[in-house]
Amino acid sequence: MPPQQQRGRGRGRGPGGPGGPGGPGPEQAPEDPDRESGGERRRGRGRGAGRGGGDKAERAQAETEFQERVVQIRRVTKVVKGGKKLSFRAVIVVGDGNGRVGVGVGKANDVIGAVKKGVSDARKALIRVPLNKINSIPHPMSGSSGAANVFLKPASGGTGVIAGGAVRTVLELAGIKNVLAKSLGSKSPLNNARAAADALSRLRTLSEVAGERGVPVSNLWSR
């Protein structure tokens, strides 16, 4: 056998080679800091609430604060190449009764799916409504959506919600207790609900108006 091949064979476990007598021994894997002396892997012993546990609890609590009301469930038809496709459309209003309200629409092949989509859409369209001490709006305001127009006017304590249909649902879930409302134009529940939400989104407090004009709030009260 040539001397070069003999040297190549002797490198395996010969004297002084890796794994041989007097050699450095076989390569070992790096130690795992999470593995104990018995070979078992240590489990985490942190004191945290878990991965995302706190966020889930806060999200669940926020969901329970909102109330959901179905304004309308309607069967709709879409003409496609193969014929007519039937589905359901749900108009949903979501609010916490403390100044937050939203209007959403959902469409699906069944009623339950349409309601779920409507609730999700309404939560994405939440608006903040400024309320005064008697749970009324700070000033008159009007809103529109399509051919529907809604006019809102503040009322004194004990008046109640003078409104009907979808407009009343939006006002109640927003937490308004005393208000006068008038609907003009279209009688569509969806357009009336959106018109009411549009009017509420335009409301402003005295402090906001004073900040925009650069004057103290007392000047607005004197007028």
Swiss-Prot record:
SUPFAM superfamilies with a match to the protein in the record: dsRNA-binding domain-like, Ribosomal protein S5 domain 2-like
Annotated segments matching region Disordered: 1-66
Basic and acidic residues composition-biased segments: 53-66
Gene Ontology CC: ribosome; small ribosomal subunit
Domain S5 DRBM: 66-129
Assigned keywords, A-Z: Ribonucleoprotein, Ribosomal protein, RNA-binding, rRNA-binding
GO biological process, one term: translation
Complex and partners: Part of the 30S ribosomal subunit. Contacts proteins S4 and S8.
Record family assignment: Belongs to the universal ribosomal protein uS5 family.
Name the UniProt record assigns to this protein: Small ribosomal subunit protein uS5
Source organism (scientific name): Gloeobacter violaceus (strain ATCC 29082 / PCC 7421)
